Amino acid sequence: MDDQFYRKSTVTGRSYDVFKTVKILNIQQACSYMDNDVFPVDIKVSIDQRSGKKCLVFYFDREESKDVYDKWCNYELK
């Protein structure tokens, strides 16, 4: 993959491929992931498209977060 798609987080210090991440805007969902030992590779401030207000965007590694995502979809995470 081209280096232009790799980022290094100023928050976590982790390097990651942007195409191998998922964006989570739901704070409850992000907290549930972290409660289950899946931590974001990056966190950024963005603008919510609907409200126009600032929001946090949590970037998680797609593979690392797959199991907790499945549990989230099945209402198995709190």
Language-model segments: residues:
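Compositionally biased, intrinsically disordered low-complexity regions enriched in proline and serine
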Residues: 7, 17, 34, 40, ...
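Positively charged, low-complexity terminal tracts
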Residues: 24, 39, 45, 73-78
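N-terminal acidic leader/helix
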Residues: 4-38
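Intrinsic-disorder/low-complexity regions
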Residues: 1-2, 16, 25, 41, ...
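Short intrinsically disordered terminal tails
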Residues: 1-5, 75-78
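Acidic, low-complexity, intrinsically disordered interaction modules
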Residues: 31-55, 59
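Long, continuous compositionally biased terminal/linker segments
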Residues: 48-78
